[in-house]
């Protein structure tokens, strides 16, 4: 098992690899009760009004207890994020987009408690962002002739959350709205006006310094 995990991690790009390791470590620590599972649950009020900032960090890596289901979820997520990370020419832009998504998510959680951890929500939004940018190249073909966009699957899951689990619109919007905002800033505005609004602060500063 250890050898399999090490081999899988070796094929994952740096940022996604660090996140995957963090998820595995936190999952193990909570299962062993070294970290209290109750203290990894994110709450805007507890973090920003009570000063329990550890919950914010824990929630980014929280994928549940150490079991086969959480392991599969972590490595499926790592596979998606590896594809996205490898599509960026600059790793710092990938990191900056993750930060922007996190800021938007945290702002949304100030209005309503999220249904999932910040790590799960970040993954959902990054997948949405990838589907919006490269969706036409990722179509799934059924019966050898019918092309189906993979974006239909998030729509289905969001519908299940609303009609079956009775989640609020804002809870559901946390799964895709931050990703849509970043996609609009990065792709649509960039194509129309030729401005890259998602450049990292380092790139903005470097461009202003360049004569």
Curated annotation (Swiss-Prot):
Compartments, as annotated in UniProt: Endoplasmic reticulum membrane
Protein name: Degradation in the endoplasmic reticulum protein 1
Its membrane topology: Multi-pass membrane protein
Consequence of gene disruption: Impaired degradation of proteins with misfolded lumenal domains such as CPY*, a mutant, misfolded form of carboxypeptidase Y which is a known ERAD-L substrate. Degradation of proteins with misfolded intramembrane domains is not affected.
Entry GO CC: endoplasmic reticulum membrane; Hrd1p ubiquitin ligase complex; Hrd1p ubiquitin ligase ERAD-L complex
Keywords: Acetylation, Endoplasmic reticulum, Membrane, Protein transport, Transmembrane, Transmembrane helix, Transport
Family from the record: Belongs to the derlin family.
Anything else known: Present with 238 molecules/cell in log phase SD medium.
Organism: Saccharomyces cerevisiae (strain ATCC 204508 / S288c) (Baker's yeast)
Residue list for modification N-acetylmethionine: 1
């Amino acid at each position: 098992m250890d050898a399999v995990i090490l081999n899988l991690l070796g094929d994952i790009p740096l940022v996604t690899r660090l996140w995957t390791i963090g998820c595995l470590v936190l999952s193990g620590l909570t299962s062993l009760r070294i970290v209290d599972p109750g203290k990894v649950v994110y709450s805007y009020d507890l973090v920003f009004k009570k000063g329990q900032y550890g919950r914010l960090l824990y929630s980014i890596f929280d994928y549940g207890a150490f079991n086969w289901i959480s392991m599969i979820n972590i490595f499926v997520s790592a596979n998606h994020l590896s594809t996205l990370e490898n599509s960026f020419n600059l790793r710092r832009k990938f990191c900056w987009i993750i930060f922007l998504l996190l800021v938007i998510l945290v702002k949304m959680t100030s209005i309503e408690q999220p249904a999932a951890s910040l790590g799960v929500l970040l993954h959902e939004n990054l997948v949405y962002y990838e589907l919006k940018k490269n969706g036409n190249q990722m179509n799934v073909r059924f019966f050898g002739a019918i092309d189906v966009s993979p974006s239909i699957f998030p729509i289905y899951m969001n519908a299940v959350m609303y009609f079956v689990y009775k989640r609020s619109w804002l809870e559901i919007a946390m799964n895709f709205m931050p990703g849509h905002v970043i996609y609009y800033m990065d792709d649509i505005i960039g194509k129309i006006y030729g401005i890259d609004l998602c450049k990292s602060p380092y790139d903005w500063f470097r461009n202003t310094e360049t004569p």
